[in-house]
Amino acid sequence: MKATALFLAASALAAVSAGAYDGYGYDPRPASSYNKTISGAAHIGYDSRYAYKDVVASSVLNRSGVFNIGGELNLNLARDWKQEIGAEYMAFCDGLLSDKDAFDASWKAVKELFPNLSFRGGYELNYGGLPGYLSKHMGKAPHSLAQSVTAGLAYDDPGHGYFGSLDVQYGFYGMIGWRVDLNAGKRWSGLIHEKVDLELSAGTGYSSSYWGPGVAGFDQVNIKLAAPVRVTGVDSSRGFRVIPFIQLDWAGNTRSEIRRYAGMNAIEDFRIRVGVEAVYRF
């Protein structure tokens, strides 16, 4: 089952990568975008409900949403490899998760395999939030902490508007097990206004033994619509943007087993999330 899910996910990402040029909103990537010595982003935003990789926490854990602030720094690593260093702080408005600050951090090594397609692999740390809370609540760790290693592919073609990602995660502390996340979408540049894009994407997540021994299946399915507004800059690779969004999230067939192992209603069956994010890229 896990092998089948991985095969289907990889095939779907390959299909997105091979998407045909539709001729609308062509905005080619600047030639130097991948060769910058240093680049990065800073963001601040609000989401009406907290979700960990699109698995929405229940109203017991968080009902009124979460504010987040974070950033990412991209530096040269070695030869044609880059490194991405990211961090994010989350402040929960209410619920059991609001009793503890939440912090995520990551380090990834990145290599461009082909134009617009890159490999990334590294380490992630989650303090608090859904993985951190359940790590301690379920007795998997003495602290509200989860750690994992990750590897995956990311595709982004600003010219033709197709984007997608396939990420494989293995949790080795706290939440122990496998997770696979697949996302794919299409961006229409200037469809609404010359400075307003439209992005439509969909995704899903599959896990094996991550939430509990023998728990395997699809964790969630989601559809997201976003309308990035370019305030400054000539394209999405740099400058300031404001991104309102709406997202529909459905829990997968692992939801009952997740609740059983957690001993509580930890995730939602269905939720509509709305939010906004301000992002500055340099």
Each language-model region and where it sits:
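Short loop/turn motifs that connect adjacent beta-strands in outer-membrane beta-barrel proteins
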Residues: 22-23, 27-39, 76-84, 96-97, ...
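Residue-level detection of beta-strand scaffold positions
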Residues: 40-46, 68, 80-81, 106-107, ...
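Outer-membrane beta-barrel architecture
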Residues: 43, 70-72, 104-110, 150-154, ...
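Outer-membrane pore/translocation modules
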Residues: 49-65, 86-183, 254-272
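Detector for outer-membrane/organellar transmembrane beta-barrel domains
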Residues: 80, 140-231
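Transmembrane beta-strands of outer-membrane beta-barrel proteins
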Residues: 39-49, 70-72, 84-90, 120-126, ...
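Predominantly the C-terminal beta-signal and adjacent terminal strand-loop region
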Residues: 200, 223-282
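Cleavable N-terminal export/targeting peptides
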Residues: 1-41
